């Protein structure tokens, strides 16, 4: 698409917004940026990248978008914003950065693998990227995982080197403003309550996820998730994965845990560096996606052995006095914490809490009753989690800080136990982000170890 001399307003000055502004300016667009409350750091970075670019600061209204032909909206900005909705009603075009990428690469020969879901998508995206590289493909991993897609696209255009495959992690927010993406293989890994502060209900949220299947590519679907099972689209090839039954990609539980492909045991899970049964599901999905674009199984299995996993995703921090300390700070919703607990084989002292984003915490109860010794609660929604678990028979304690909770968990844990930070909540009520929350946990674990030495 030709952006030369088009009046484009980039809405939201986060990482994807900054990348969009740079990309569009490089293609000759007349760029304006609008943000209700931009940080000084982002404004300074924008000025360094695009000196003199017009910036509209403050609540959006009709004047904010006056004269614009196209709005490029960042994922954190709801399309239901009254000024954006009015722009659309008046015939204005509103897209996101994924849509700009989709239009740019259409027909260029690159493969696209698209990954969404409530939980596990960052792990699966990273794993798929690793497996594609292991199979010899020039691979770009981008999207919701951290690298803005338009930053990656601009770099590739400037180098003149088209990748073999784009591996994209996509949030529901990104998919809302995406229309042309035609992935060669795509998955919705699972659906659990998340972002209900932005969606009417769980079905509304799930519907946004289904946009990943626009086009005619291979659908890789979770047979164990009822909402995902309902996403089959006529005319699409489908590959199923399951931990609990027969599927194209399944788990054998006799004689240890083995990954099965088309009924044949092909990989001993003991050879993976990832912990927990939920990561077996992630591996099955990744194999389905990679085989969906025609990659050979043998090279994929070799790649599985060398994937180390992601920071802050069920990551072992340390082990001393027979107690393992595991960081799952990226577990920001109930489904993620459920998965972490269900993947544990040792008794757990759980640290949870933060900003619950309107979730129902009831599903935590059976998972905690199965494996937890105690639950320590922090943050804004500690009381709501406590109410959901109050008749569970578990020891429940509230703590004012994560440092206090970590020290208390270490005191309650017995040799052979796991202290698990898996908050089931966002972090912004107490921390800069989930990585900051993780670092506080890691530092406190180190202090506990030093005090016991």
UniProtKB/Swiss-Prot annotation:
**Which top class of enzyme applies to this chain?**
ligase
Taken from the UniProt record, the cysteine pairs bridged by disulfide bonds within this chain are none
What is its pathway? Cell wall biogenesis; peptidoglycan biosynthesis
Q: Source organism's superkingdom?
A: Bacteria
**EC number of this enzyme:** 6.3.2.9
Write down the SUPFAM superfamilies for this protein, in alphabetical order.
MurCD N-terminal domain, MurD-like peptide ligases, catalytic domain, MurD-like peptide ligases, peptide-binding domain
Please provide, in alphabetical order, the Gene Ontology terms of the cellular component aspect for this entry.
cytoplasm
Q: Which GO terms describe its biological process?
A: cell division; cell wall organization; peptidoglycan biosynthetic process; regulation of cell shape
Q: Can you tell me which family this protein belongs to?
A: Belongs to the MurCDEF family.
This chain's protein is named UDP-N-acetylmuramoylalanine--D-glutamate ligase
Origin species, per record, is Chromobacterium violaceum (strain ATCC 12472 / DSM 30191 / JCM 1249 / CCUG 213 / NBRC 12614 / NCIMB 9131 / NCTC 9757 / MK)
The gene is murD
